[in-house]
Amino acid sequence: MAETTITDIKQSAEQKMGKTLEALKNDLAKVRTGRAHAGILDHVLVDYYGNPTPVPQVANVSLVDSRTLGVQPYEKNMVGKIEKAIRDGDLGLNPATHGDVIRVPMPALTEERRRDLIKVVRNEAEGARVAVRNIRRDANASLKDMVKAKTATEDEERRTQDEVQKLTDKFIGEIDKMLAEKEKDLLAV
């Protein structure tokens, strides 16, 4: 009985750490590098009949070239709203409307903007590291509770803490790797 509970704690910790890593991957994808990619507008919300809706749900977002996106709304009356949402978003983009197509040029990143974005990415990564460490802390607290309740021995607790620590190290290593890749992307001119 005690083994399955310890296994549950390890599996739960690994699952939560995996979700933290996935969340970081999504957060890093939002940070704009100099290149255009359709996913950059996924988190820009436009008012669609009173509901905040992601741009890709109300328009076709495509790559015109490596530094320009084309946004073609499904409904012509949405052109102005989508353009305003993109402009007001915190991505620093300046869309231009040509008929019923919105062109979104990706401005080249200035050195100062690159430094700012690197700070943002480092903060995101640090937040993920903290989350992983908190998951480790919670797992260790659960183990201590099991020892107090006499459903696990102190040896099992120590062994499992070591395994959870190895998991923590593995996920923090992944976070550092993702951060290094994103920084390299941002510094590439």
From Swiss-Prot:
Q: What does the protein in this record do?
A: Responsible for the release of ribosomes from messenger RNA at the termination of protein biosynthesis. May increase the efficiency of translation by recycling ribosomes from one round of translation to another.
Citing just one GO molecular function, the answer is: ribosomal large subunit binding
Record's family?
A: Belongs to the RRF family.
Q: What SUPFAM superfamilies does the database record attribute to this sequence?
A: Ribosome recycling factor, RRF
Q: Provide this UniProt record's keywords sorted from A to Z.
A: Cytoplasm, Protein biosynthesis
Q: Which GO terms describe its biological process?
A: cytoplasmic translational termination
Recorded hits in Pfam families, A to Z, give: RRF
Coiled coil ranges: none
- GO cellular component terms? cytosol
Under the heading CDD domains, the entry gives: RRF
Q: Which organism is it from?
A: Thiobacillus denitrificans (strain ATCC 25259 / T1)
* Protein name per the record: Ribosome-recycling factor
- Compartment annotation: Cytoplasm
